Curated annotation (Swiss-Prot):
UniProt organism field: Escherichia coli (strain K12)
MF term (GO), any: ATP binding
Single GO biological process annotation from the record: glutamyl-tRNA aminoacylation
Family of this protein: Belongs to the class-I aminoacyl-tRNA synthetase family.
Annotated protein name in UniProt: Glutamine--tRNA ligase
Reaction(s) catalysed by this chain's protein: tRNA(Gln) + L-glutamine + ATP = L-glutaminyl-tRNA(Gln) + AMP + diphosphate
Length: 554
């Protein structure tokens, strides 16, 4: 298969192919323009993969440009976080990082050009009055009483705005288009507003700041963007995008194309709702492993490759739809099943004593991956006292139960066959110790007499066990569409985080944050980057071995 045939196909790539074939463009230049007022989430990952992926596949360029036109909400912390997320996902921007604020002088000059052409005016209506005058979807707007000021008066007033002569909210610059337009975005939109706030890039040079719709199209043109890709909520804004570029003196006129945004089950994407989860302490921060943020997914153990694969699978369309969480989980599960080394950890431990085991212990050899001998093997200590999971033992059980039962045998993973003989309980009737015997001639082999032992359970040597905290993360919400609830906070899943104290094999003391493991028979886990210490490692469950929510939805 050729490189071109291996590329994903979608309507945007078809447009690009046609543009290149017709000679409209000789190269492809895209951009990813986040506002630095929060952390990126999985929805942004779709846009990142689309814009950078197209540039990569067509051997073009993709700019990283921060839409930093609102100094009140923006911060350098978000700038650095976004840069880190883009790089972590495996992409590299063309040239230096760009900022819309790089173009503030040019934007100001273009605003003056519109005033000189009679296409922009300074309005002194209050923000509330502007909303009132704008009209509705069924009623046209009405003209501002300040709409017909002369060019000279507008130039003087705009300079007064620039010089700090108006208070915030007392004046703005508006485009002069059509207050009766069926598209509300074209009813004399605001181009500049006043904000007395220090900007993280330009300091206190400016007290007037351009609006997104004015900034976006001009920044695209100044950078030579060929295909400006936005989500569908900006579809009507394309009219304003084109109007601005049609009415200023600029040699390049990019085209905007819209695609559907990513909606994912069992989570919310709204910045306001995500912020509420953080500020009300429903989660511990923007990088909480239950959050849909890229930093949260990374801390949970998601790989960049799995997120890229997810974005590839869901594709790019103009049709709004909601993607099943199982699709995202399937991508990370497939990735880690293929690439994660295996290890043993007991999440809900109960002591097991092998009464006829002689000696202090021994080392058993275990493969790091059952299907990849090239990943090597490791030595795991075994002894006469081990920890097993409480769910792996029953005093009585039916034939479907393939684990340890009183009076019956089971195999310890890569070790011996054992038989449960008796148990010891506390005053409440809880089992505290299981006493067993073992067949010394069954180390990693079948019993000599040919008897069949069907069940296999994992274990950790008690004398060598590494105490660990295990955080069992699950979906943050208990319903597929929490945003549709009257109060989305009321449908938070109370079991989205369950903390257990368990034991792991000693090799895991060398685990590093971001490195994934399959805890055999339990799921995929990674060392937590925030809470782990050398004395007490903390492991986060990335995803289970199978989709446990499938039955819930049936």
């Amino acid at each position: 298969m050729s490189e071109a045939e291996a590329r994903p196909t979608n309507f945007i790539r078809q447009i690009i192919d046609e543009d290149l074939a017709s000679g409209k463009h000789t190269t492809v230049h895209t951009r990813f323009p986040p506002e630095p007022n929060g952390y990126l989430h999985i929805g942004h990952a779709k846009s990142i993969c689309l814009n950078f992926g197209i540039a990569q596949d067509y051997k073009g360029q993709c700019n990283l440009r921060f839409d930093d036109t609102n100094p009140v909400k923006e911060d350098i912390e978000y700038v650095e976080s976004i840069k880190n997320d883009v790089e972590w996902l495996g992409f590299h921007w063309s040239g230096n990082v760009r900022y819309s604020s790089d173009y503030f002088d040019q934007l100001h000059a273009y605003a003056i050009e519109l005033i000189n052409k009679g296409l922009a005016y300074v309005d002194e209506l209050t923000p509330e009055q502007i909303r009132e005058y704008r009209g509705t979807l069924t009623q046209p707007g009405k003209n501002s009483p300040y709409r017909d000021r002369s060019v000279e008066e507008n130039l003087a007033l705009f300079e007064k705005m620039r010089a700090g002569g108006f208070e915030e909210g007392k004046a703005c610059l508006r485009a002069k288009i059509d207050m009766a337009s069926p598209f509300i975005v074209m009813r004399d939109p605001v181009l500049y507003r006043i904000k007395f706030a220090e900007h993280h890039q330009t300091g206190n040079k400016w007290c007037i700041y351009p609006m997104y719709d004015f900034t976006h199209c001009i920044s695209d043109a100044l950078e030579g963007i060929t295909h400006s890709l936005c989500t569908l909520e900006f579809q009507d804004n394309r009219r304003l995008y084109d109007w601005v570029l049609d009415n200023i003196t600029i040699p390049v006129h990019p085209r905007q194309y819209e695609f559907s945004r990513l909606n994912l089950e069992y989570t919310v994407m709204s910045k306001r709702k995500l912020n509420l989860l953080v500020t009300d302490k429903h989660v511990e921060g923007w990088d909480d492993p239950r959050m849909p943020t890229i930093s949260g997914l990374r801390r949970r153990g998601y790989t960049a490759a799995s997120i890229r694969e997810f974005c590839k699978r869901i594709g790019v369309t103009k049709q709004d739809n909601t993607i099943e969480m199982a699709s995202l989980e399937s991508c990370i599960r497939e990735d880690l099943n293929e690439n994660a080394p295996r290890a043993m950890a007991v999440i809900d431990p109960v002591k097991l004593v092998i009464e006829n085991y002689q000696g202090e212990g021994e080392m058993v050899t275990m493969p790091n991956h059952p299907n990849k001998p090239e990943m090597g093997s490791r030595q795991v200590p075994f002894s006469g006292e081990i920890w097993i999971d409480r769910a792996d033992f029953r005093e009585e059980a039916n034939k479907q139960y393939k684990r340890l039962v009183l009076g019956k045998e089971v195999r310890l993973r890569n070790a011996y066959v054992i038989k449960a003989e008796r148990v010891e309980k506390d005053a409440e009737g809880n089992i505290t110790t299981i006493f067993c015997t073992y067949d010394a001639d069954t180390l990693s082999k079948d019993p000599a007499d040919g008897r069949k032992v069907k069940g296999v359970i994992h274990w950790v040597s008690a004398a060598h066990a590494l105490p660990v905290e295990i955080r069992l993360y699950d979906r943050l919400f208990s319903v597929p569409n929490p945003g549709a609830a009257d109060d989305f906070l009321s449908v938070i899943n109370p079991e989205s985080l369950v903390i257990k104290q368990g034991f792991a094999e000693p090799s895991l003391k060398d685990a590093v944050a971001g490195k994934a493991f399959q805890f055999e028979r339990e799921g995929y886990f990674c060392l937590d980057s925030r809470h782990s210490t050398a004395e007490k490692p903390v492991f986060n469950r990335t995803v289970g071995l199978r989709d446990t929510w499938a039955k819930v939805g049936e």
